[in-house]
Amino acid sequence: MARVLGVHCINDMPTVYASYWAERILGEARKVGHTTRELTGAMVTSAGLQSSMEQYKPDMVILAGHGGPNVFTGAGMQVVLRGCTNDGMMKGSQSMFVSCLTGLSLVPSMVSKGSLAASGFTKEFVWMIDGMGFPAADKYAASFTRFWVEASRALFQSGSWQNYYQVGKRVWAEEEAKWEQSTDPVAPSVILCIRQNSSAMVVNGAGAMEVPEGGGVFSFLPVLAIGALLYSRNK
């Protein structure tokens, strides 16, 4: 079975949700028999990740936190991964970024340095929250939690990035349809977030099939990575 590494830390409210999603993704990995390990808190640094990659040799890396087009950040918002600089440490693994914007440059750079596959978003990953700070009970964030749970489940159960992508798109479509029927005044904002996230999904890797957004889908050797997030608070 695969070795899955979860990388996440809490710096602010968005990363509270990111860390929660990372834990849910790791839970899906364990359900099908994969082994998991976590790099959390103050250990989420460039040196910490490199040490984990060398010692644990994960097949899949889940990276959850703030990101930009060419960077993923960790403890204290310090840069953990930077494209064309230290992303070669991900060689031979696969990654899933729960993060903003990493699909623009960092994901392609990692693949060019030897990563087998990596997924991310080409826009800011956005969602609505109820302002209470408890992701598991947040009715507005539930649609976004469902995406991470069901898409990662499809990946771990089938070993196919294509299934990850297709299930993810289906979840977005179903959640959009649900919110279109809602009379909640926040519903239009939730729908806008769903549409943005759905349009920004990308998966890159050697031999990947093209998808409408320009990324790719492919069979997976185990690894998840996660990046950065943007959130919208319901006032």
Ranges and model annotations:
Residues 10-14, 43-46, 66-71, 100-105, ...:
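Solvent-exposed loop/turn segments at secondary-structure junctions
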Residues 32, 91, 112-114:
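Short, structured coil segments at secondary-structure junctions
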Residues 1-64, 96-97:
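A domain-level signal for caspase-like cysteine endopeptidase catalytic cores
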Residues 82-107:
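Ser/Thr/Gly-rich flexible loops in soluble cytosolic domains mediating phosphotransfer, phosphorylation
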Residues 229-235:
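C-terminal membrane-anchoring or membrane-association module
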Residues 213-229:
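A short, hydrophobic C-terminal helix/tail in secreted or cell-surface proteins
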Residues 67-91:
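A short, glycine/acidic-enriched catalytic loop
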Residues 103-210:
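Active-site-proximal C-terminal subdomain of hydrolase catalytic domains
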